[in-house]
């Protein structure tokens, strides 16, 4: 029985004893409620069978008006908004915003605070890459890697919690330094119905000393943990079949689309703000920039693995310096930094400064600046304009994921539907920063 129909739904007209049929591509939605969408990505795919003809990313589902919110509050009350942009790379976002404010104020954080920022930027980089490799492997069917990666993420998020009290949205960086000195005692697990006896002692074994002791112990063990990830993935036949030659981005395409970070370095372009435009104390530590050759999903994976090794190396150097060089972590300037609790409770002028600072903030001289950091996903920048008031006149945020997502249509064409998932994973997109 012939069931061919026209676009209108009725039977196709007869011509020379045959029915006319119209063959057209199939349009389907990937996301926004899809585990491989990495957030609220809605990808409208035009398919020719299993082959992608066109990909149309729809953005805006996580738009929260962050830039406008930051313009409605004093400078020092908007740092928390930055954490919620790329919510996997929290402190790097803070760093860009804080650097922009410091540039307009004409101040510089103490050296110790800059080393702490450098160390936590790299802890954040490892957190991000662990999430990317774990979830990317899970998207392609390798579940074990995710469990391994989250084992290390748990330890690093404990470092976040030790300095700020929060596991994710830290608000630890402040104009003029950081919120507080590194704690002398690493918090320990307490006995509970889930953690008792031998397990509790094992978990607390590395927590007997300070935070620096805990981080140093982590840097000694982490290279072996990376070896475990590589054992599971790097030479895995199925992993290579799903990633080698998939989503190839040429150096020319990467630069034309404004790609940064691993997306650019994976294509063979050795551009890294930590080397080209050093900030914090990156010019005082020794590290290398991993660069790919093929520009495919597999090279981007290898770059992230190599970057974790380099981040571990930077963290170890920062720990050694911080041990040997005590000092202030915040400027002693009550116009931009709050007085200590002891000073506030013993000196009336310090109390006034404290109240004014947290109620109305401070006036930032009129001017404009752009401050950027090498975030785990690429160049995260903050363009800040001040008109001399206590609130920004304009805040514009450069999210690396937005430029990367813009290129998806060009790069994904001609690939199979299953390859789209692999490419989204190595693009490392988070919609908090894309939609802002």
From Swiss-Prot:
NDH-1 shuttles electrons from NADH, via FMN and iron-sulfur (Fe-S) centers, to quinones in the respiratory chain. The immediate electron acceptor for the enzyme in this species is believed to be ubiquinone. Couples the redox reaction to proton translocation (for every two electrons transferred, four hydrogen ions are translocated across the cytoplasmic membrane), and thus conserves the redox energy in a proton gradient. It comes from Stenotrophomonas maltophilia (strain R551-3). This is NADH-quinone oxidoreductase subunit D 1. Its EC number is 7.1.1.-. The gene is nuoD1. One of its GO terms (cellular component) is plasma membrane. InterPro entries: NADH_Q_OxRdtase_suD, NADH_UbQ_OxRdtase_49kDa_CS, NDH1_su_D/H, NiFe-Hase_large. GO terms for molecular function: NAD binding; NADH:ubiquinone reductase (non-electrogenic) activity; quinone binding. The keyword Transmembrane does not apply. NCBIfam families: NuoD, PRK06075.1.
